Amino acid sequence: MIKRFLTLRASFAIAFFTAFAFSAQSAADLMDRANALYRGGKFKNAIILYRKAADRGADPVAVSFNIANSYYQTEKFPEAAANYRKAVDYSNGTFSPALFNMASVYFRLKQYPECIAAYHRALKLEPDNVSGWLYLGEAYSKTGDKIGALKAIEKAYALDKSDISFVYQLSEANIAVGDFERAVSVIREGYSSHPEEIDFLVYLGDVYRLQKDYEQSAGSYREALNIRPDDVNTMYKLADVLVEDKKQFVAMDVLANILQIQPNFTDAAIFLGNVAYDTRFFERAESAYEQAAKNGSPEAVFGFKNLAYEARLQKREDEALRLLKLAQKYYPADATLEAEILDIENPDR
């Protein structure tokens, strides 16, 4: 944010001293040299010349502001804050770049109440400063003031609805205060304005799911999949919400479709195996675990062990042994598999 105001600062200082070149030529020269040092990254030397310029009658607002910027670049934030404060005082509180930058420094120092106060003063001077409202919202969130954060982000969104990131931020702010209806409304409005942003539909599904409205969540994911039918990540989200909605069989079909599109999606294979296991479709579970194992998943071994355990509960020792040896094929270094196999093969040892 400091960089955003650096150009404004330079034009302010240079314009001022051009106007008074004849009455304070030496101060103007010092400011020009200091600015050149600043642009060259020699911030300590720039500070020395800025102070000399001040002794020669340079404008104290410009000097304090430029010194503050130099301190900021060297990460001396307390010194930067003190000099921004001087620039504000010398300008009788009218130089908004100093206020915005001072607020930014307070944020870096984690002095959030001071940061919030500075942003409010700056935004009274520049009420259309979108980034200022966003940073104010972030500062409020750091203090736990969810309402303050929401109001600030609402201001930013009202000023610029073309930035899709504001839609997400405003929705999150509404969710934070429990206003899911408003969050959904903002997302729908954003999608209406930016129909190319399919991720809005996916995000809408996430919000509905957070609200435990699983049917609406699945509907939003499906709406996105109508446009991007091969989006395996959205398909995975759909399967997940279907399981939460106790629609495991539909979820298994979705997961199977994912694996047809992307056979090496091991998370989907494990998920399918687990859902099939929970619904007692053990053959389907075995197939899914083996697909995951073939593609290097370290988790599939636990699926095989669970299936073997179920087989032993049913007194099907041969089936348990087969499953454990199948697992050993993919995980030969797993000592627990070897131990379980020996236990079945040598029950009397």
Named regions from a protein language model:
Residues 56, 90-91, 125, 159, ...:
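Structural marker of alpha-solenoid helical repeat scaffolds
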Residues 66, 73, 100-101, 135, ...:
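Canonical tetratricopeptide repeat
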